[in-house]
Amino acid sequence: PRPGRPRPVAPVMSYKIKSLEVDARVRDQVAQVQVSQTFVNTGSRVLEACFVFPLPYDGAIDRLTLLVDGKEYEAKLLPAAKARSIYEGYIRRNQDPALLEWMGTGMFKTSVFPVPPGAARKVTLRFTQLLKKYGQLTDFLYPLASAKFTSRPIETIRFRVAIESRAKIKSIYSSTHSVDIHRADEHHAVVQCEAQNQVPGEDFRLFFDADQQKLGASVLTYRPHESEDGYFLLLASPEVKAAREDRQDKTVILVVDRSGS
């Protein structure tokens, strides 16, 4: 018998994220954020790409701008109900299950654009966001966890957050990542974080405390479940002073009520 005709092999469709760079400027409670993501079509056919950006939850987003290789593209901000419908459509097609983590928060979506085999595209998103605040503590969040479902590790992940505050900056702390902090003076600081060849496992989160008092202190509490023990985080920092100025004495007292009342 004649050998059967070989079946055609479907072209491989794949991509990798080469770099993800986040550059933010925070003035008091308002953040101007620029996100640049470079991805490469590593497959053998044209890739129809659609850039989807889950919005930071509880963040007021304004002034959205999208550029692809420096060219501005039409894009739209979807409300929560429409975003939920699109999310569920992705799940039915087994695409990007990470989007389930952001159901109900809304998302940013571009038009589809082609990427030739072997070509790279740089997508840049700029937006202004009103940050959440807990007393004197300001919370900056970037939704990085949705990238953990990418098929390959991201070659370079880089964060730079420049903080400017009218009040004196006290504590600066990231609960999720190891960061480098450079303080130019008591009103300005730059926070940086970089990783190579990693698949993100959680969002990037940064807290900073700004106060006019000589000693800044903030407390955060967390309880995973009603039946589990809770935790608290105390951030305390004196103001940044010149060498010739007197240092403020510090006495730290912790009071724990175990009565259950």
Describe the residue ranges of each PLM region.
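Flexible hinge/switch segments at interdomain interfaces of large molecular machines
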Residues: 243-249
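Cleft-lining beta-strand/loop regions that shape enzyme active-site pockets
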Residues: 237, 247, 256
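Short acidic, Gly/Ser-rich segments with clustered Asp/Glu that frequently serve as metal-coordination loops
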Residues: 258-261
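Hydrophobic "anchor" residues on beta-strands that sit immediately upstream
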Residues: 253
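Subset of Sec-pathway N-terminal targeting signals
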Residues: 1-236, 242
